[in-house]
Amino acid sequence: MADRPVRGSRTGRPIMALLDLLGRRWTLRILWELRDGALTARALRSACDDASPTVLQARLAELRAAGLVEHAAGRGYGLSEEGREFLTAFMPLYAFAERWAASKPTTPG
């Protein structure tokens, strides 16, 4: 069974669309900030203090289109069920990548 084309992906493949989305600045930070509960756009801007409101709104729109984030009036933005599953599955790999990037490679002397 062939994969359906995915809007927003350069290749049309779902996994590549997800990687494209994750490669955009602030995407993972937004998901991480939403892990404990819903936040307003203002609270997210405070948590992501280097992001402009325009960039955050663009990332939130992409995350909503991907089905990872929901928006409820009066409650703010929160993770969808798929977003929670994704974060649970992805964060060990993300934590490993962060540790690996922080370690200094040894050079042969």
Show where each model-derived region lies.
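Charged, amphipathic alpha-helical coiled-coil/dimerization segments
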Residues: 59-105
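N-terminal helix-turn-helix DNA-binding core of bacterial DNA-binding proteins
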Residues: 8-55, 66-68, 77-84, 107-109
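Amphipathic alpha-helical dimerization/coiled-coil segments
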Residues: 2-3, 10-14, 32, 88-109
